[in-house]
Amino acid sequence: TVNSIFNGPGGTSNLKRMVDHMIQNGDMEPGIIVTPTYYNSASGGGNDAELAKAFPEEFVNDLVPAVESQLHTYAETTDREGLKQSRDHRAFGGFSMGSAITWYMFIDCLDYVKYYMPMSGDCWAVQQSGGEAYAEQTILYLIDSIEKKGYTRDDFFIYAMTGTLDMAYQGMTAQMEAAKRYPDMFLFGKDQQTGSICYNVLRGGQHTLGFCYWYVYHALPYFWTK
């Protein structure tokens, strides 16, 4: 959340300093970064899987309008049509359970978000931890959701990451290997010019917040560069 990741308004944190330097050095375009939680109470808790699945609806109906109606963005309006027209200027990413939410966002919010950054977590749409147990079915589910909205591989870019010592490595890698069998939709490349998806694995990377910062640092320039 904003308090745990950015240390609140006016505060400082490693991630905040990192992003500021990236913008200052020209590694990425200036932007607005919002760090919400999917929990429905300040104390957290609840059914993670159900809360994750419900988040995309809250994102479109509540979160984005609350932010973009108060700030200068590419959205001329914050209704669904306005958000759809400005989808090229919006990205979503998350670590661990946030990565599972990122895959739900890809399924439900492709109309409103073009770029995705799942970090150390597979897609749970078919079943919890389904990226590993049901990799093929998971990829076919993702493809079906894209095609139903009328999009092609040219309409999105996914930069997925994890580490070799991360507990999410096997599940995420199984899902990526299944995706490679469908290059008509998931064309693997190093950037937007060469593909619709990139999978970056950090040797020795573990399931900790410090490695999450490393992933963010390497992904953001691939979405918007000067």
Give the predicted meaning of each segment.
Residues 1-226:
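Non-catalytic cap/lid and distal C-terminal segments of serine-dependent acyl enzymes
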